[in-house]
């Protein structure tokens, strides 16, 4: 037990830690633009835009081609496989467009969920086969971090011991493989907001899941300084009749994290989990204003909560590009402020930013 076979060299560790720190530098968070083709279909349907490869490229070009000052708010962008090999309107590959702004490029590497037989509809996540080779290729193609999402749910029987153990182990195995290939793993154990559970129930489940995840990461010799965590905020279920304030959400979330996430982890980038754009910003802001000691950066890794207003403004029309970009930049700046606890809402939130983005049993 005393001897150790070092998983990573000193140089490898240094590279991973540097990448992780760059992504969560003060005031910076992550733009999750890794929606699958199927998920983009749902997004586009709402604005009556056909889900073609060109339309997907066009919308992402709009996000990635905003002014370079976006790098003050966005430290990393997560891409979907298709997007990694697409080009901007000017014919430049997207990873280069993003890197030239000083932003780190990431890639979603999981292959979606699969049912766990004998459980109440719980899942594990697929994609470990061939992952090492894919990571090596992605690193060559300009990526420096990766994302893998595991999904858990809350009900009378969930999350079960099997569901927790299996997903924790899969996340740890993924994280280890990423680090061997020079990619910083974003570890994402998402507890879905579906259900009528209250804040306390979500906090309890979140603590149990995160404790298991960090035990598994330790068992697999994962270098924590070269990882990031992407958890759910502790919120009540969408069908819960009691509504909680951002302060209550912040207290429950930070308490759960303080109990389970080692101080060696450089940053925690929350998923927005179907909250409205404004709600996601207010909750993050409240966390960063708490007097509780927080050893890690608390930031964002938002998809819908950074893109909803931009999508509504765009409507698939080139003429709306500027308005759409402005909407995206505005949200990015607000979340940058929230990640420092400096967001002061004006009370002027637009309709698109206050609309719930909840989708039942959400799949990317």
Swiss-Prot record:
Top-level taxon in the UniProt lineage: Eukaryota
UniProt keyword terms in alphabetical order: Cytoplasm, Cytoskeleton, Glycolysis, Lyase, Schiff base
Main EC class the enzyme belongs to: lyase
Membrane spanning stretches: none
Keyword Lyase: yes
PROSITE patterns hit by this protein: ALDOLASE_CLASS_I (PS00158)
GO biological process: fructose 1,6-bisphosphate metabolic process; glycolytic process
Pathway assigned in UniProt: Carbohydrate degradation; glycolysis; D-glyceraldehyde 3-phosphate and glycerone phosphate from D-glucose: step 4/4
GO cellular component assignments: centriolar satellite; cytosol
Pfam families cross-referenced by the UniProt entry: Glycolytic
Single GO term (MF): fructose-bisphosphate aldolase activity
Coiled coil start-end: none
UniProt subcellular location: Cytoplasm, Cytoskeleton, Microtubule organizing center, Centrosome, Centriolar satellite
Catalytic reaction(s) noted: beta-D-fructose 1,6-bisphosphate = D-glyceraldehyde 3-phosphate + dihydroxyacetone phosphate
E.C. number: 4.1.2.13
Chief location of this protein within or outside the cell: cytoplasm
Necessary for preference for fructose 1,6-bisphosphate over fructose 1-phosphate, annotated site positions: 364
Active site positions: 188, 230
Subunit structure: Homotetramer.
Family: Belongs to the class I fructose-bisphosphate aldolase family.
Name the UniProt record assigns to this protein: Fructose-bisphosphate aldolase B
Organism of origin: Danio rerio (Zebrafish)
Phylogenetic classification of the source organism: Eukaryota, Metazoa, Chordata, Craniata, Vertebrata
Gene: aldob
């Amino acid at each position: 037990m005393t001897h150790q076979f070092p998983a990573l060299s000193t140089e490898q560790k240094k590279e991973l830690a540097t990448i992780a720190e760059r992504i969560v530098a003060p005031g910076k968070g992550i733009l999750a633009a890794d929606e699958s083709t199927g998920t983009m279909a749902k997004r586009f349907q709402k604005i009556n835009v056909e889900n073609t490869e060109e339309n997907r490229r066009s919308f992402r070009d709009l996000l990635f081609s905003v002014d370079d000052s976006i790098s003050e708010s966005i430290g990393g962008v997560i891409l979907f496989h298709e997007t990694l090999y697409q080009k901007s309107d000017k014919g430049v590959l997207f990873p280069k467009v993003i890197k030239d702004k000083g932003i780190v490029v990431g890639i979603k590497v999981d292959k979606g969920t699969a049912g766990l037989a004998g459980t109440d509809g719980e899942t594990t996540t697929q994609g470990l086969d061939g992952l090492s080779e894919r990571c090596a290729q992605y690193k060559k193609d300009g990526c420096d971090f990766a994302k893998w999402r595991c999904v858990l749910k809350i009900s009378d029987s969930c999350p079960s011991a099997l569901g927790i153990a299996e997903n924790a182990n899969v996340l740890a195995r993924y994280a280890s493989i990423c680090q061997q290939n020079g990619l910083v793993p974003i570890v994402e154990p998402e507890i879905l907001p579906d259900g009528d559970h209250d804040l306390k129930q979500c906090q309890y489940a979140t603590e149990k899941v995160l404790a298991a995840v960090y035990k598994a990461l330790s068992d697999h010799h994962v270098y924590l300084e070269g990882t990031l965590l992407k958890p759910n905020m502790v919120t009540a279920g969408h069908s819960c009749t009691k509504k909680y304030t951002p302060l209550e959400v912040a207290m429950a979330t930070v308490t759960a994290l303080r109990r389970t996430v080692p101080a060696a982890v450089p940053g925690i980038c929350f998923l927005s989990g179907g909250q409205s754009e404004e709600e996601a910003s207010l909750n993050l802001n409240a966390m960063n204003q708490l007097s509780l000691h927080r050893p890690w950066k608390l930031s964002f890794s938002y998809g819908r909560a950074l893109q909803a207003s931009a999508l509504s403004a765009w409507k698939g029309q080139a003429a709306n590009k500027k308005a759409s970009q402005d909407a995206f930049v505005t949200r990015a700046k607000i979340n940058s402020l929230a990640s420092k606890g400096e967001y002061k809402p004006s009370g002027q939130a637009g309709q698109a930013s206050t609309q719930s983005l909840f989708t039942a049993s959400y799949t990317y």
